[in-house]
Design a protein with these regions (language model features):
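Active-site-proximal beta-strand/loop segments in catalytic clefts of secreted hydrolases
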Residues: 1, 25-29, 95-98, 127-131
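Short alpha-beta junction capping motif
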Residues: 1-33, 121
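Short amphipathic alpha-helical segments and helix-helix/interface helices
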Residues: 9-13, 83, 149
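Glycine-rich, charge-decorated loop segments at or immediately adjacent to ligand/cofactor-binding or catalytic sites
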Residues: 30-42
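Catalytic beta-strand/loop cores that center a nucleophilic Ser/Cys/Thr
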Residues: 45-120
């Protein structure tokens, strides 16, 4: 979506490595700098597609013990369901399963929706939810981002 200079990239990555938190959602974080592999490694993933554009889908909370997800149950969204390339070292907190209705070869694929990770001494939180502000009227989506940002800031 955008570009980042080597100097800017190094500054951001260095800041997180020494303890700064980084949190974000949707394409603003996972499709910011397609040409920056180092940024993608730090974030833990890269957007690929949203088959069907705005559709109904389910978000499945997979870790009910984590402070970011404690007390949350699965919930429905009507938004872009992100298909992503994701780092297997992420601590996945929520996933979604693709129906295959819009792209048959991804039927049954489970893709992380929300994750967190350490990057050096820093913390990184990401949620693919949040294409438009209205998406955060869904309590589960809003709570995940609120708690995730707080976790990353510690």
């Amino acid at each position: 979506m955008g570009s980042i200079t080597e100097e800017q990239e190094r500054g951001l990555i260095d800041a997180v490595e020494v303890g700064a938190g980084l949190a974000g959602w949707h394409g603003g974080m996972a499709d910011s700098f397609r040409e920056s592999i180092n940024y993608q490694f730090m974030v833990g993933g890269q957007w690929v597609a949203h088959p069907g554009n705005i559709i109904e889908y389910e978000v499945n909370v997979v870790d009910h013990e984590d402070p970011v997800t404690a007390g949350l149950e699965d919930f429905r969204m009507r938004s872009e369901q992100y298909y992503m390339h994701v780092d297997p070292s992420n601590k996945v907190l929520a996933t979604t399963t693709f129906s295959g209705e819009h792209v048959p070869w991804i039927e049954g694929n489970v893709i992380p929706v929300v994750w967190k990770r350490k990057w050096g001494k820093g913390r990184v939180f990401y949620s693919s939810l949040g294409h438009v502000a209205k998406d955060f009227e869904v309590p589960g989506a809003r709570t995940l981002v609120e708690r995730g940002m707080l976790w990353a800031s510690k």
